[in-house]
Every structure is written in structure tokens, then in C-alpha cells.
């Protein structure tokens, strides 16, 4: 039902793409369902594995969609010096990614179209939908 509404609507569909299995599977499923993906947004961590460039090129080649790469204005090592190592409980690293991606998405032109950001995560990560940054993305 949701997919059919998206197909008819005037939406800008943005896939937040980490290059991992969950976001890759989500992108594949959206395209197979006929959802028009307008942007694939990739946050460069500055510490990416060398193989990630090959994976991004493969995804672009297979989907025909260019991948938009965004970066935080402050170098990762500067953040590390200020705040210490990121924590799995959701420290500054997640906030850094969120702010950067959200700034890009809000800056997209699109007339009156709504923007939907798709974020792929596994079923055991459902708690992520209740975090403050996720609620901020939904305008609540």
C-alpha cells in the first residue's frame, strides 16, 4: 500500500546508502518495486575500506543511479581529538552523519514535492526508529 502511494505521489525519494548489506538490499527492493529513486546519498566517513569505492561503482553501474557523496565540514581526526572515540550507544559519529545528510536533503530543490529519506536497517535494529534524530527527520 505504501509503495503504491509513493508511485503516484509527487515525492523526492532519497536513499541513505551506507554501502552495507541493509542499505544495498533496501535500494534493490525499492527499485524492484518500481519506486523512482531520485537520489542515492552516501556519507563519506574518511575511513572507508578501499573496497567501498569498487562497491559504489558497481552499484552505480548496475542501477544507473549516480551516488551523491557528502562529507562533514570537520575532519574525522578533529572530531576524535575533541570528543574521543565514538560509542556504539550513538555518540557524536551518528549525529555528525545525521546533520550532514539532513542539511543536504533540506537544500534540495524540488518545488512542492515532499522528500522521503529511506534508511535501511535490519529487523533487530527497530529501536533506531525511536531515536531523537529519526524523529527530527520526520518533522516531529
Give the location of each predicted region.
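ATP-dependent adenylation/nucleotidyltransferase module used to activate substrates
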Residues: 1-140
Amino acid at each position: 500500500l505504501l509503495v503504491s502511494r509513493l508511485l503516484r505521489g509527487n515525492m523526492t525519494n532519497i536513499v541513505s546508502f551506507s554501502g552495507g548489506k541493509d542499505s544495498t538490499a533496501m535500494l534493490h527492493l525499492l527499485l524492484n518495486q518500481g519506486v523512482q529513486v531520485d537520489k542515492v546519498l552516501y556519507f563519506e566517513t574518511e575511513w572507508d575500506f578501499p573496497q567501498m569505492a569498487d562497491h559504489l561503482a558497481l552499484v552505480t553501474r548496475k542501477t544507473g543511479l549516480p551516488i551523491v557523496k557528502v562529507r562533514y565540514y570537520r575532519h574525522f581526526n578533529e572530531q576524535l581529538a575533541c570528543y574521543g572515540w565514538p560509542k556504539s550507544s550513538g555518540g557524536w559519529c551518528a549525529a555528525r552523519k545525521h546533520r550532514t545528510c539532513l542539511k543536504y536533503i533540506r537544500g534540495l530543490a524540488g518545488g512542492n514535492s515532499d522528500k522521503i529519506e529511506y534508511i535501511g536497517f535490519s529487523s533487530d535494529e527497530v529501536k533506531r526508529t525511536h531515536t531523537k534524530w529519526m524523529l527530527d527527520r520526520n518533522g516531529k
